[in-house]
Design a protein with these regions (language model features):
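Periplasmic N-terminal accessory/gating domains of Gram-negative outer-membrane beta-barrel systems
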Residues: 120-169, 177-178, 187-209, 221-228
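C-terminal beta-signal and adjacent terminal beta-strands/loops
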Residues: 4, 701, 773, 829-841, ...
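Short, acidic, small-residue-rich periplasmic hinge/interaction motif at the N-terminus
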Residues: 27-47, 70-78, 86-134, 142
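Gram-negative outer-membrane beta-barrel transporters
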Residues: 696-839
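Outer-membrane beta-barrel signature, preferentially recognizing the C-terminal barrel domain
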Residues: 357, 420, 554, 558-569, ...
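Outer-membrane beta-barrel transmembrane domain signature of Gram-negative proteins
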Residues: 409-424, 428-429, 441, 453-585, ...
């Protein structure tokens, strides 16, 4: 009772003080620190009270203050600022752009510390992560970018099979995942160890962006221009620079959860970020811990999507005489006797793989003196992903053992992905030069475990779980960079140069013997069908049937002869110059020479210019040459995967480019891809609250590395070394890495933003689009293989390169903040794509493919956030609010299963409600 009385007295005093406090009017103007322009729509709140105002179109404001000591100014995209009133009646408030320390502005694509995205000579997007984490449905790095950047493309699992389904690889401008370079805090990041198989970017390696906690990121910069001359190999399509948080004295917690309409596919993600100041001179350490879960998702769309309608206990892929006795009625009777139905054999996958992610990262810096800082950043992550493949039915006698799995089995592949990196460096002044000495080490490891499977060729001796091996990729980069700004050379000259030494490594570790072994060829024993109507081997476990599938099914283990441990060294030097000829005219140039220990020298260059016709209009253009060194994995990777063609499981070997079989076919060793790129664009800021960029681009790439189509073991014209390879591995088909084709990519991109005061609230509208076209301009057919032109570059691979990524993408997003509410409305247009699916390989020289056009789709997200206090916000919303799905697989290629949604445009999750909670303590 005493506490209640005290509370009543407290609120009475507070209320009375508010009534009788003397009124005063405070006014002023709010401007932006970067361009000094007035900011309209800035929210002004009296700290501790539910009173406030917003700035007018000219940035001015006026607010009546009855009580309170502080005014809080906040605006989307800028850092909030707290100002003490202390008797003042007029204020001139300057807001800094969010995430930018104005003493250290760094925009990727320029080594001039004062360059901004609008006055850059190349197209750069700068994406603030904070509002997306609070209001958008997406939570992982790749999905956040997929729905905000028109030139960026990534779908869950990249529509790949096996280990590739664990990754969501990043692509820019429709080019490959290995033709974009990723930096963290401006330093080169290491790649994933995995070689993507069967999906977008087939045959490529890429960057595992989702191993970086989204909660650790301050902003992401996307350079949409070739930059190999500035940053080295891979930067053909552009560069993604992830800038980590430096903020201190703030504990931020973001947690979210979502589920699909049928209750499957639930996700959770919790991120905790905290920064601590070190000393009194600006030192800091900012750390993030993040944990995420993904539950299994069923195929989206119709309730019977993926339902199997064919023979179950007989009539399998390798039909033999006794299978003729099995009819649908007999199958259904057996199912009923077992208490199951056809849904027991459903596919289990319908989007992202189920799994768990545990991520840690940090970013730190400490001044040694007024001109010298030491810094470090890095992280470690462990991610588990489970992939299930095609159900092995009990009637598939070549792939099942009915004593072990009477009802067949659904093999499961579990990938454990461990990723770690550490960067340390020291930067400061040596005379008038800025000097940065750094070392960055990174490693990515994929381990493959197969469960609920078997090696059919071993009979009852087969294990059901296998260690199928693992592979590792590492990179260590040491760099020394110099830069200096000469203020008195014309209107300013920035000179940068430096050197790097990089060591890259790749390793394959063999799996356990049962994961790859094949039993001896022995006499076929008869099949007895007298036991419960279920076929079994009369002498199973003692004698193996000739022709049964060898190795762990879903993913065959790496064989000892495929194990490798290779490395290479790269030495590079570069120079980068930017000259402001006049206040309006900027020219820049860069050159880079690199030496690779495995294939020699490469030189690239870039030239760019920008001219300001007025404060609101810049014209820019660039030309560059680039290259991409083949990854070690592409040169040495060997693996066997199972693909189902016309309902029949086929073991396909991806053979090493270094193998004798490759040489026998006439396939040479890999060489670098080389590119030429051109861009022309404009930027405009007609007002302080609107920005617009438009850029056209053309990229020619020669000798792109990819997987050939599949050579078949039944082809009598193949060289002896290739036939030996088939005999050793038991594979029915084989493909090789090869510099097989050249391409041309052209397109137009536009981006823009508009900030406006709307009915006492702030509206931040973002828009962008990319319209592109990819075409194959040349196929490099090895001498002697002219008849195999449709195998060297198969129609399926041609489609992956040219038409599997939407040629048109439009992003529209509005965030409206008023009082305590924040509303997000976003819609993204994914253009038409065309797929090519194998129908028949009866003629190995001319395989038959079915082409399917998938219609364009609009995907719309909606959310509403409520800010309970200045430090606590809750958000609820719906991803894909109209439940828009892509087209279903055409029945002619769906086989004996009902068609499922083709998720190649944006994934296939369908409608997905979500909630988020963001707190700052």
């Amino acid at each position: 009772m005493k506490k209640i009385i005290l509370l009543l007295i407290f609120f009475s005093l507070a209320y009375g003080q508010n009534i009788f406090a003397q009124k005063r009017t405070v006014s002023g103007i709010v401007t932006a620190a970067d361009d000094k322009a007035p900011l309209p729509g800035v929210s002004i709140r009296i700290k501790g009270l539910n009173e406030g105002a917003v700035t007018k179109a000219d940035g001015t404001f006026s607010i009546v203050v009855r009580n309170g000591k502080y005014l809080v100014f906040s605006f989307l995209g800028y850092e909030s600022q707290e100002v003490e009133i202390d008797g003042h009646k007029e204020f001139n408030v300057v807001l800094k752009p969010a995430g930018n320390d104005l003493n250290e502005v760094q925009i990727v694509g320029s080594r001039n510390a004062n360059r901004t995205k609008l006055n850059s000579a190349s197209a750069v997007d700068v994406i603030d992560i904070k509002p997306l984490l609070e209001s958008a449905p997406q939570t992982s790095v790749t999905q956040l970018l997929q729905y905000i950047s028109p030139s960026f493309h990534s779908v869950n699992g990249s529509n790949a099979g096996d280990a590739g389904s664990a990754l969501s690889l990043a692509q820019l401008r429709g080019l490959g995942p290995d033709q974009v370079l990723v930096l963290v805090n401006g330093k080169r990041r290491h790649k994933s160890a995995n070689v993507n198989y069967g999906g977008l970017g087939n045959g490529s390696t890429g960057y595992d962006l989702n191993s970086i906690p989204a909660g650790s990121i301050d902003r992401i910069e996307i350079l949409r221009d070739g930059a190999a001359a500035q940053y080295g190999s891979d930067a053909i399509a552009g560069v993604i620079n992830i800038v980590l948080k430096k903020k201190t004295d703030d504990l931020s917690v973001n947690t979210s959860g979502s589920t699909r309409r049928r209750g499957d596919g639930a996700t959770t993600r919790t991120s905790v970020n905290y920064g601590v100041g070190l000393g009194n001179t600006g030192g800091y350490i900012n750390a993030t811990a993040e944990y995420a879960t993904q539950a299994i998702a069923l195929p989206a769309g119709r309730a019977d999507a993926g339902l199997y309608n064919g023979p179950i206990y007989g009539g399998g892929a390798n039909t033999r005489g006794y299978d003729a006795i099995y009819t649908k009625a007999i199958d259904d009777a057996i199912l009923a006797s077992r208490g199951i139905n056809r849904h027991f054999f459903d596919q289990r996958g319908g989007g992202a793989n189920p799994g768990q992610d545990a991520l840690l990262s940090f970013n730190a810096g400490f001044p040694l003196n007024k001109t010298t800082d030491i810094y470090a950043f890095g992280g470690i992550s462990s991610r588990n992903s489970q992939f299930t493949a095609v159900y092995r039915l009990p009637g598939w006698t070549s792939r099942n053992n009915n004593f072990i799995y009477p009802d067949g089995f659904l093999p499961d592949m579990e990938n454990n992905i461990v990723d770690g990196s550490i960067a340390v460096g020291i930067k400061g002044k040596v005379g008038d030069w800025n000097v940065d000495l750094s070392n960055v080490f990174g490693k990515n490891s994929f381990s493959n475990r197969v469960d609920n499977s078997l090696n059919a060729s071993l009979g009852l001796k087969s294990p059901t779980s296998f260690d199928a091996g693992r592979y590792n990729a590492g990179q260590n980069t040491t760099g020394l960079d110099f830069s200096r700004y000469f203020e008195k050379v014309l209107k300013g000259l920035n000179v940068a140069f430096g050197a790097q030494h990089r060591i890259e490594s790749f390793q394959i570790i063999a799996g356990e013997e049962g994961s790859y072994s094949k039993a001896d060829q022995r006499t076929i024993v008869d099949v007895d069908t007298t036991t419960g109507g279920i076929p079994y081997l009369s002498n199973a476990g003692v004698t193996s049937l000739n022709g049964l599938a060898a190795g762990s099914q879903i993913h065959l283990g790496f064989r000892p002869e495929n194990a490798v441990n290779v490395s290479r060294s790269i030495t590079a030097g570069y120079a980068d110059v930017e000259l402001n000829v006049t206040k309006a005219w900027l020219i820049s140039g860069a050159g880079r020479a690199e030496y690779f220990s495995d294939f020699g020298n490469v030189f690239t260059w870039k030239a760019a210019t920008r001219y300001s016709f007025a404060r609101w209009l810049n014209i820019r253009g660039s030309a560059n040459t680039g290259f991409r060194a083949p990854d070690l994995a592409q040169s040495y990777y060997t693996s066997i995967s199972t693909t189902f063609q016309q309902g029949k499981g086929v073991d396909i070997l991806t053979a090493s480019n270094q193998s004798a079989a490759a040489r026998a076919l006439g396939i040479p060793k890999l060489t670098p891809e080389k590119s030429k790129g051109y861009a022309l664009g404009l930027t405009s800021a007609p007002g302080s609250n609107i920005e617009l960029t438009v850029d056209a681009y053309l990229i020619d790439i020669d000798n792109r590395v990819g997987n050939t189509g599949n050579f078949t073991s039944t082809d009598v014209n193949l060289p002896a070394d290739v036939k030996t390879l088939f005999q050793q591995t038991g594979a029915a088909q084989a493909n090789f890495f090869y510099n097989e084709f050249s391409t041309r990519t052209k397109g137009v991109e536009f981006t823009g933003s508009y900030k406006v005061l709307l009915d006492k609230g702030n509206l931040n509208f973002l828009f962008g689009g990319n319209f592109s076209k990819n075409e194959v301009t040349k196929v490099n057919t090895p001498k002697g293989l002219e008849a195999y032109k449709n195998v060297i570059l198969s129609p399926g691979e041609r489609a992956r390169v040219t038409t599997n990524i939407p040629a048109q993408k439009i992003n529209l997003q509005g965030i409206y903040s008023v009082d305590k509410f924040t509303f997000l409305l976003r819609t993204v247009y994914f253009g038409k794509v065309t797929t090519a699916s194998l129908v028949s390989a009866a003629d190995p020289l001319n395989p038959v493919y079915f082409y399917q056009n998938l219609k364009p789709i609009w995907v719309t997200d909606l959310s509403v956030g409520y800010r309970f206090t200045a430090k606590l916000q809750a958000t609820a919303g719906v991803n894909n609010v109209f439940n828009i799905l892509g087209d279903y697989t055409d029945p002619s290629i769906a086989g004996l299963r009902n068609p499922t949604v083709v998720g190649i445009q944006n994934g296939s999750a369908g409608i997905q409600p979500f909630i988020k909670l963001s707190a700052h303590l």
